[in-house]
Structure formats: C-alpha cells, structure tokens
C-alpha cells in the first residue's frame, strides 16, 4: 500500500498539482498543536528528490474556530470517553445543529516554508532518489523533521486571537469562572491591546472588538451569561461550557507566554 501511495503522490507532484494535508495527522483534543506526523511530508520530500519538477513550498495555515459543532463530543473525549464511531444518526444530529450560531472560522496563512532552502541547510540539496522503494538517507530524514517543526512554528505564529479565545483566557483564570462585568471588559481591553502592541508575530491577527463588544459577542454565542447583581452585573461561563472553553484558551496561550514573564 505504501509503495502505491508514494507512486500516486509522486505522479501528483510531477504534474505540479497543489496538495493539502494536515501536519498534525488528526484533531487536537486540547487546542494546542500536536507533534507532527511526518509520513505524508516524508513522501513529499521523497517524491521531490526523485524528480524536481518545480520548487515545493509548504504554506502553513492556521484555522481557528469560535465554537465547535462537535462540542459535546469533545467534552466527552476530554473526560475520557472513547471516540464515537461515525453513523447516519450522528450525521443527522450534526445537521440539526447547523441552525445554531457558531461564530466565525478564522483562516490565516503563515510564512511559507521552501523545501529547497531546508535541503541546502542540511547539505541534502544534491541528493537524488532513483526508485520508489529507495530508502531515505539520514540527511533527508533530518530535512523532514526540520521542515515539520518549522511548519508547526509558522502555524503558531499565524494565530488569530479571536473574541472567544480572549474570553476563555480571562474567565477560566478566575475563581468560579466569574468576573464583574466592568472588570471583565477592562481585562479584555488590556489583553487585546497587549497582543496588538506586542504582537507574537507580524502575521498574528487580533480581534478589533472592544471589551464590551467581546462580552456582547460571547452572550450572543451563548458561551457566557450575565448574572444580575445589586453591586454590578457579573459575567460567568455558561453551565457545562468551561471544559469546552479550555480548547479556545489553549489556542492562544503561546502568544502570551513571553509577556507573562515581564
């Protein structure tokens, strides 16, 4: 099977056809990037060294969500439940959720990774592979590992700091996941301004919404709720949403690591 698939991939590369695949190999259960799965990447490099039609460029792509359609499934898996097998009933349940509000999907492109540049860095640019079943030399294995790490780093740099991620970051750090509304709005403004003025990377994108607008947005998505109080309204995470919001918090944690050390 591997030989057939490698040959198929080689034929696609020979025709200069764009290819999409996911470097993590599967969906993250935590919201953080997974260690790279290098199988497809290794086959791509192998095919390139068999016959260089055109230079290969990997375009790291960040995809961020504001709400997960399979949120209940995610929470169950985080609590140790086995992954459910796909079924017709499951598809019908998913279709019924389409009418709900799921916010936006954010797509952002990271710095391109040029394969030929990494081959040169590892002194592997002169290597040629003659056959489909020829093993990958050690230098090329290093190229594959290096390419995978750079792709993941560039995905992280292209992070989109969206309203839901900021809400999650702030409310999950509070006792009982609640905060005075005025203080919450100010905290959101501070974090947004920090991410804007001290960006994680030039490709990082930050929401333009103010703290009050972010709160209104979270209420619209039914991820948080407003609790009336005589001393001032309280913003709290909706029931059973705390575990789910850890996913969105973890999406952006790396962007605040260095500022948190100051």
Regions found by a protein language model. Give the residues of each.
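Membrane-interfacial terminal anchoring regions of lipid-handling membrane enzymes
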Residues: 1-262
């Amino acid at each position: 099977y591997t030989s057939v698939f490698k040959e198929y991939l080689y034929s696609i590369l020979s025709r200069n056809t764009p290819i999409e695949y996911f470097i993590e190999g599967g969906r993250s259960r935590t919201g953080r990037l997974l260690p790279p799965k290098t199988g497809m990447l290794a086959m791509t490099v192998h095919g390139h060294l068999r016959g260089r039609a055109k230079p290969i460029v990997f375009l790291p792509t960040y995809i961020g969500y504001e709400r997960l359609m399979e949120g209940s499934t995610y929470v169950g898996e985080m609590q140790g439940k086995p992954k459910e097998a796909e079924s017709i009933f499951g598809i019908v349940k998913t279709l019924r959720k389409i009418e709900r509000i799921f916010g936006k999907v954010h797509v952002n492109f990271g710095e391109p990774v040029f394969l030929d540049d990494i081959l040169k860095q590892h002194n592997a640019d002169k290597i040629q592979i003659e056959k489909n079943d020829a093993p990958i030399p050690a230098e090329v294995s290093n190229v594959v590992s290096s390419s995978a790490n750079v792709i993941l780093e560039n995905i992280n740099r292209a992070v989109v700091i969206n309203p839901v991620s900021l809400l999650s970051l702030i409310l999950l750090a509070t006792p009982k996941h609640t905060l005075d509304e005025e203080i919450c709005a100010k905290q959101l403004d501070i974090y947004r301004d920090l991410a804007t003025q001290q960006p994680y990377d030039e490709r990082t994108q930050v929401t333009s919404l103010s703290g009050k607008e972010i709160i209104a947005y979270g209420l619209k998505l039914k991820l948080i709720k407003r609790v009336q109080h005589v001393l001032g309204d309280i913003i709290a995470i909706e029931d059973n949403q705390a575990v789910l919001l850890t996913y969105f918090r973890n999406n952006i944690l790396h962007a605040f690591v260095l500022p948190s050390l100051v």
